[in-house]
């Protein structure tokens, strides 16, 4: 009742919903007054739609009713069939119970049938049994003639006869070993023929890469024979599940043996490529690896293009050969890695393993694509072995670089003693071959390392810079020893100045080469940071160059010593040409120094200028002369001014092109001359004060020596000047370069000077 009530409510709701929808639809149609004229047209159209929907609904209901009627009919038929089957099963069960005793009484008949089957098999194979010796001979002849397919056909006949007889015997009396042995013995030659045929097959497979090019039919025959044997193996193993019998020599597993033979052949081919040893050829490993590369590439191309046509697809012959070659190469590379390799041999091996193997020259060759995916290949050497080789290489390379640098320096040292001048570069600067030799060696090792990996390249660069740092320290020591040796006998070496210039220039070449090396081989900021953390070599190179320049200037001033000693003496005052000789000597030396590269020549010129002025002022402070009159003071002061101008002109000439101020130092001589030239002693304090204000490093002993040189200052005046200057010490300007600081006044105390 509840169900009918719910259905009624649902129908009522549906009617109400339909009415509401209709009202809404009519309202939508009649929104304007002019649409009232079309009411009849709208009504007829809706009536047609209603009739169409009702017709489709009736057809659908009728179809559903027909389906239900058909289903009921089929269910009725199925029920009748089930009843019939049930009755038939009952009849079969009844008949089976009644026939049990009858079946047991037929056991003798069953045994007779089995015996008959065995005898029938014997009769069927009788012809083959009698012809076994003849078939054996024919098979042997065919094998020797190379007719492998025909030989295998006859071998199959022999094995089939033997296996059939033995199987029947096994079924009839599995425990009768004597009869089984008799049959096996009669067919004893069969196993020997099988082994002989197998040898021929393996020989063909061992030369398969040659055979496939010359006689692919022979290789196809071998594969067909192996495939036949595989089918026989599968059939016998299936029969074993039913009978438990397996013929002797089965399963042969010739397919498995075929892949084993191919694997051994590949291994032998890889191992047999080593034609030389280290003793007979230093490049033995490079030659060995190149032969391997060529052989493997050629073999795989042949396998891809030709061998795959001779084997069934499911053998995946190319994939298997690729795996065999890869494994054989991995084993060979491990064997080579375990040997005591030299540094260049380690590089050759790692370059081949890490780069050549996967490159377009080998596994990445377009002729092997797409079957060979280099990204899927396992590494030939494990990361641990590669790491050990790299460690060994770095250790050996370190020792080699140290030895190479030592030898290069020894060779360069021998050149320093030559009687001939060193070579000059394209700009005319003296140089030796040392920087070129050193950086050529670095370049070679870096290029080699870059072939292996970027990481190794960076490590080698760091190593080179480290060893360069140590090398430059030794270079500095050797240059110092060279200088000391020359000072012991200035006549030797003959070209001391020229080779010392070359040593100085080498420092600039080393600097430029280091910058070039870093720029070329450092690609990332991380690498640059790594190398910048290494000790800077600029300081050592500048120290070597500075020492070299100092030694050359020392050479100059040793020659000038005699003429410097003439300054501020009676001879000088009477007209000595010491300054003329000094200028000529300095200019002559600087003609040789023109072979020094610009940065160092600039510093050397400035230092020579400063030192000449210092030596001149030192002569002033040496108390070699004391002027006795105003005329002598005037004459001496004017001579000092003229000589200052001479020196100024000289060093302007030497410093041309450097942008150096060649006047500052010579102005000091002029300032001192002004103090000497002063005619009014009462103004002496003012003049000295001016001098002290310009040169704050001037000391009391310098003033005392200067006043003593004038020869006209009273003791009280000297004392007053000295005390006044002591009360107000002058402050030096930030840019002032001390010049009097180096000048030592002879050990006469101030009191004596004042007297």
Swiss-Prot record:
Keywords: Acetylation, Cell projection, Cytoplasm, Exocytosis, Golgi apparatus, Protein transport, Transport. Its main location: cytoplasm. InterPro entries: EXOC3/Sec6, EXOC3/Sec6_C. The modification N6-acetyllysine is found at residue 38. It holds the Pfam family Sec6. It is found in: Cytoplasm; Cytoplasm, Perinuclear region; Cell projection, Growth cone; Midbody. GO terms for biological process: membrane fission; mitotic cytokinesis; protein transport; vesicle docking involved in exocytosis; vesicle tethering involved in exocytosis. Disulfide bonds: none annotated. GO terms for cellular component: exocyst; Golgi apparatus; growth cone; midbody; perinuclear region of cytoplasm; secretory granule membrane. The exocyst complex is composed of EXOC1, EXOC2, EXOC3, EXOC4, EXOC5, EXOC6, EXOC7 and EXOC8. Interacts with EXOC3L1. Interacts with BIRC6/bruce. Interacts with MYRIP. Interacts with SLC6A9. Belongs to the SEC6 family. PANTHER family: EXOCYST COMPLEX COMPONENT 3, EXOCYST COMPLEX COMPONENT SEC6-RELATED. Component of the exocyst complex involved in the docking of exocytic vesicles with fusion sites on the plasma membrane. This is Exocyst complex component 3. The lineage of its organism: Eukaryota, Metazoa, Chordata, Craniata, Vertebrata. The gene is Exoc3.
């Amino acid at each position: 009742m509840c169900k009918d009530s719910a259905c009624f409510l649902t129908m009522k709701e549906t009617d109400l919903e339909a009415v509401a929808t209709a009202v809404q639809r009519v309202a939508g149609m009649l929104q304007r007054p002019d649409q009232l004229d079309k009411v009849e047209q709208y009504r007829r159209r809706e009536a047609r739609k209603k009739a169409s929907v009702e017709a489709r609904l009736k057809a659908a209901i009728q179809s559903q009713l027909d389906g239900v009627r058909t289903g009921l009919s089929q269910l009725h038929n199925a029920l009748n069939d089930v009843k019939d089957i049930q009755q038939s099963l009952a009849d079969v069960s009844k008949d089976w119970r009644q026939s049990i005793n009858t079946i047991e009484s037929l056991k003798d008949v069953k045994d007779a049938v089995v015996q008959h089957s065995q005898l029938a098999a014997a009769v069927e194979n009788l012809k083959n049994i009698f012809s076994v010796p003849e078939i054996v001979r024919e098979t042997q002849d065919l094998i020797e003639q190379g007719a492998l397919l025909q030989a295998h056909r006859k071998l199959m006949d022999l094995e089939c006869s033997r296996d059939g007889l033995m199987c029947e015997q096994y079924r009839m009396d599995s425990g009768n070993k004597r009869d089984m042995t008799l049959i096996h013995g009669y067919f004893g030659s069969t196993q020997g023929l099988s082994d002989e045929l197998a040898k021929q097959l393996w020989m063909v497979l061992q030369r398969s890469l040659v055979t496939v090019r010359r006689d692919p039919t022979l290789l196809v025959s071998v594969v067909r024979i192996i495939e036949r044997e595989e089918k026989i193996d599968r059939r016998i193993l299936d029969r074993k599940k039913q009978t438990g019998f397996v013929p002797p020599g089965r399963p042969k597993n010739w397919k498995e043996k075929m892949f084993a033979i191919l694997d051994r052949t590949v291994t032998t081919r890889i191992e047999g490529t080593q034609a030389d040893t280290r003793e007979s050829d230093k490049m033995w490993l490079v030659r060995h690896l190149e032969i391997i590369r060529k052989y493997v590439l050629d073999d795989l191309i042949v396998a891809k293009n030709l061998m795959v046509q001779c084997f069934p697809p499911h053998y995946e012959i190319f994939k298997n050969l690729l795996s065999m070659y890869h494994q054989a190469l991995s084993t060979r590379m491990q064997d080579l890695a375990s040997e005591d390799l030299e540094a260049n041999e380690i590089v050759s091996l790692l370059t081949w393993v890490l780069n050549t193997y996967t490159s377009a020259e080998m596994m990445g060759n377009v002729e092997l694509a797409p079957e060979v995916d280099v990204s899927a290949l396992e590494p030939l050497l494990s990361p641990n072995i590669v790491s050990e080789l790299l460690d060994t290489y770095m250790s050996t390379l370190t020792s080699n670089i140290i030895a190479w640098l030592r030898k290069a320096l020894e060779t360069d040292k021998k050149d320093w003693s030559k009687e001939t001048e060193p070579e000059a570069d394209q700009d005319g600067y003296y140089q030796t071959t040392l920087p070129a030799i050193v950086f050529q060696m670095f370049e070679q090792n870096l290029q080699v390392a870059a072939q292996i990996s970027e990481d190794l390249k960076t490590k080698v660069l760091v190593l080179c810079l480290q060893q360069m740092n140590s090398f430059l320290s030794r270079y500095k020591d050797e240059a110092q020893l060279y200088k000391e040796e020359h000072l012991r006998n200035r006549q030797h070496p003959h070209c001391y100045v020229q080779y010392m210039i070359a040593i100085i220039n080498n420092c600039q070449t080393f600097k430029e080469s280091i910058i070039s090396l870093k720029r070329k081989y450092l690609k990332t900021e991380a690498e640059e940071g790594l190398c910048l953390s290494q000790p800077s070599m600029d300081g050592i190179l500048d120290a070597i160059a500075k020492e070299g320049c100092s030694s050359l200037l020392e050479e100059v001033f040793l020659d000038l010593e005699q003429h410097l000693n003439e300054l501020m003496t009676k001879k000088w005052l009477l007209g000595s040409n010491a300054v003329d000789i000094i200028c000529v000597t300095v200019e002559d030396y600087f003609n040789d120094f023109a072979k020094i590269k610009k940065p160092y020549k600039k510093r050397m010129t400035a230092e020579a200028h400063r030192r000449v002025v210092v030596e001149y002022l030192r002569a002033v402070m040496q108390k070699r002369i004391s002027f006795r009159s105003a005329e002598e003071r005037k004459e001496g002061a004017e001579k000092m001014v003229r000589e200052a101008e001479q020196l100024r002109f000289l060093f302007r000439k030497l410093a041309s092109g450097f942008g150096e101020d060649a006047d500052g130092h010579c102005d000091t001589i002029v300032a001192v001359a002004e103090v000497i030239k002063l005619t009014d002693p009462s103004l002496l304090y003012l003049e000295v004060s001016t001098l002290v204000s310009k040169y704050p490093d001037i000391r009391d002993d310098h003033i005392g020596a200067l006043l003593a040189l004038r020869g006209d200052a009273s003791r009280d005046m000297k004392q007053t000047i000295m005390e006044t200057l002591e009360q107000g010490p002058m402050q030096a300007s930030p840019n002032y370069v001390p010049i009097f600081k180096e000048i030592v006044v002879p050990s006469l105390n101030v009191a004596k000077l004042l007297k």
